Amino acid sequence: MGLSIGVHILNLLTIPALVFIYYFRKTEKVTFKGMVYATLIAGAILLFINNIIIPYTVWIGAQIDTLFVNTFGLPVNSGITLFALALIIGLGWAAWAAHRRGRVLLNIILLSTTMILVGYSSYASVTIRAAANPPMNSNNPNNPHALLSLLNRDQYGDRPLLYGAQYSAPPEGVKEKKVWYLDEDGKYKTATVLTGYTHAPEFMQLFPRMWNYSKGEKAYKEWAAYRTKTETLRDDKGEVLRDAQGRPMRGETLDFGRKRAYTDSYGETRTVTEPTFWENVHFFFNYQLSYMYWRYFMWNFVGRQSDIQPSRTTITDGNWLSGIRWIDEKYVGPQDNLPREIAENKGRNTYYFLPFLLGLIGLVYQLNRDQRNFSIVLWLFVMMGIALVFYFNTSPGEPRERDYVYAGSFYAFAMWIGFGVMAFKDLIVRLTKRDDRTAAVAATVIGLVVPGILCAENWDDHDRSGRTYAHDIGWNYLQSTLPNSIILNYGDNDTFPLWNNQEVYGVRPDVRIMNTSYLGGEWYIDEMKTKANDAPGVPFSLPKHKYTFNNDMIYVTNSIDRPVEIKEVIDFVRSDDPRSKVKLADGTLADYIPAKRIALPVNKENALASGIVAEKDRDKMVDTVFINIKKNSLDKNQLMILDMLANFDWKRPIYMTQVYILQDFGLMDYLQFDGYAYRFVPILTPYRQAGEVGRIDPEYAVPLLLDVFRYGNLDDEKVYSDYFTQYNLSAARAR
């Protein structure tokens, strides 16, 4: 179990099944009381490992390390190393003492805990690797406090399970947490971070499934509303719809939530729509269970409509499909005269319920023949399926399908499919009076129909041979860039292909890849400041205390109603003078940017020398690039981009994989499209419309498009271009 934690935390969900295996082996007569005790023990073990061993082992080591580093002046990680040695020696001595005194149960508990900790110690490799400061070092867990944050999955935040507030609940206050971090002087320091909001008791309720305030009423209403009401119909702009005679049109609409009034901090009365308890229950069954679990289950054992991921629930994409016409027509409508892209989609796989039915037969067979082992498989099925649905408390609008999360549950059902073959064997023996060997062969032949149809239906859309487009996206982005460039990207799809090319295949080690999604983390800013491969660090100038648990959001004002040079702006933010601060409502002082119009001078000679501008375009350069901040605040990642622009002095080309990275700075008029990536250039090209952003230098881009870029062998008819490949290819075309 300890080793499995090092592989994936979801392995803990096998604990109930393992406890029942032990219980069944140790008892001859299974009783209801015994099963209740076994369940309670399984829950206790699960909580002990997940809530005590995993967090508190490292937490104690982190506290000792803080004492050793801050008080005794010893090196970082010396305290947790001594604690680990003392823990191993202590557990070893305790287990030996328990053995000598004949304390069997205590000895088993101590040995089990020791083995769990031995496996858990594999996470020490994470700290060892981080200490080496590799080019890719997520969260930089080079000390026990950073490792603890990683293990606690702090970056994902908390979500309520049994009791809490819903998405519409107005915040009453903030939740804060003290965190430890390693400062530049080698000492541990503390900071206070915002972890959430507090809410008035009247906005707290049981079973809060609709908790994510970033989603809003529209996303939840689609899945949770089950009541209707008659009211005046309105269009998307809120205008009343009228018939030919000009009379207001009335119709049935979804009735959602209940109105609740409250008094805000300014003493004004406001109203919010609060979902009811039964709407939360409906959302749980309709979206979280049905759409986000049973739909995936049916994909695997009944069939799948297509490999197209819908942006929202539709009747044409993303559903299960059996291949049995009368069932499918009832569920997803008529299947005649379908568009070609639906009817010929290789992801349209139909199994005619055969795997599902064979699994049900196996389930009933095992239940009748071996109830003990049936309960073990059932524990695996439930814990890795329905229990995870409850724990994840998923919100609508997932960026990708999450069927892989429930693979363990589907493995359990596949066991019942195997028992279904055994059921056929027993049936053949009973009907034909043949020996077991002949019946086993016959049952196997019959059972092979299921994997046979799965193979026949899935082979074409799961065949990735020859398709290299995911890799080639990264290749193309990197090859778009000039030597010694910095390329800014956003999100997974624009990041991992670049990392793969650079770190695995050694493509363009001179380019610094910077993921702006991570740039809000102080660890990533520190990482970007250092050299990686052959690429120098990003020229940030703000000191560590300005971005370490600080300035997650910085205000932008028009205090100076004229363009201010960018270095002066960064110097203003860097200053600790109280006059360079703004006083917040709670009386604290915060950094701010005093101007929305910022001047970025152009060093033309550097721009020419670095290749940012070709010699033939010398006369097209402007003297100053003007940044126009359109918002009243910037996120930390945008502040750091501003810092980079203040200090790069046009010595290194800057690229973006998406034009919108610079949209909030008003810099979309200063881009050049180099085939895949956009180059930031001091040449004004007024923004025209989406898809026509920036200028193009044919002498630079055309050779790349024709001779350098790779397109994943998509011109080969034998290579399958699935939905995500087509989606990313369309995005590349749009750019």
Regions found by a protein language model. Give the residues of each.
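ER/secretory pathway lumenal C-terminal domains and tails of membrane proteins involved
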Residues: 1, 9-406, 413-484, 496-735
